[in-house]
Regions:
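Short, acidic, metal-binding catalytic loop of nucleotide-sugar glycosyltransferases
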Residues: 33-42
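A conserved acidic beta->alpha catalytic loop
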Residues: 48-57, 108
């Protein structure tokens, strides 16, 4: 996909963090600051789908303060799945490729303070994917309406039982990936929206890669509007059905 990449200089961090954004001017500044305050060896890639608010402007301001931030501006809203795969390709193309790539929501539903926990699980278990899980012991969701909880539980049940996937939380977007796995799987990632979460787990499962879950607290966004639409729910169900037919 065509995009404009803003930011100069070589990146050489051990960790790449992908932050897909659309209309996140109320959240992106404090999220970037929270990540920077962790003092980990990480580079941040914000992928913005030409938000009509001030998201990109805020990121550019942060770039004047931190040299480890890159901004990818895509011409239009193109889906979470393509944003994440564009982010994967960006980090895999670096001269000094990071060892791990993380994904998380830019609306502060995922707490940056949980990043070290995901990384520790990755270091200890040498996984393809570590999932920040809402559904293992210690994991929790705050602020979701009952209908959203039902949708999430149903989506996870469909993925687990129809595709034979082992993780309890197959739809969490808070993750750490090894670039060893991403290098093998990237050509098989074709999702456009939220089904990317299922597709990556399925690709790891098909290749017999190890996956682990670590508990996190998911807090429903307090600022801005939810990005999950009925179209994206249909895309998720369509992908799952296609995957079943290929099994």
């Amino acid at each position: 996909m065509n995009y404009q990449l803003i930011g100069n200089g070589e990146l050489s961090s051990q960790i790449g963090i992908i932050l897909p954004t659309y209309r996140e001017e109320e959240n992106i500044s404090k999220l970037i600051e929270a990540i920077e305050n962790l003092k980990i060896d990480a580079s941040i890639l914000v992928i913005d789908d030409s938000s009509p608010d001030g998201t990109a402007k805020i990121v550019k301001e942060k770039q004047s303060k931190y040299n480890n931030i890159r901004l990818m501006i895509r011409p239009k809203k193109s889906g979470l799945g393509t944003a994440i795969t564009d982010g994967f390709r960006f980090f895999l193309s670096l001269k000094q490729m990071p060892k791990y790539v993380m994904t998380m929501d830019a609306d502060y539903s995922h707490n940056p303070k949980d990043i070290p926990r995901l990384l520790s699980t990755m270091y200890e278990n040498d996984c393809a994917i570590v999932i920040g899980s809402r559904y293992v012991k210690g994991g929790k969701i705050e602020g979701w309406p009952f209908t959203r909880k039902i949708i999430s539980r149903t989506a996870n049940s469909i993925a687990k039982f129809s595709l034979g996937l082992k993780p309890r939380d197959c739809t969490s977007g808070f993750r750490c990936y090894s670039t060893k796995f991403l290098t093998e799987a990237i050509s098989n990632l074709h999702s456009h929206t939220y089904e990317i979460q299922i597709e990556t787990i399925r690709q790891a499962s098909l290749r017999n890669f190890n996956m682990k879950e670590t508990p996190v607290l998911f807090v429903n966004r307090k600022s801005g509007k939810s990005k999950l639409t009925s179209t994206e729910i249909r895309s998720y169900l369509t992908y799952t059905l296609k995957a079943i037919s290929r099994s």
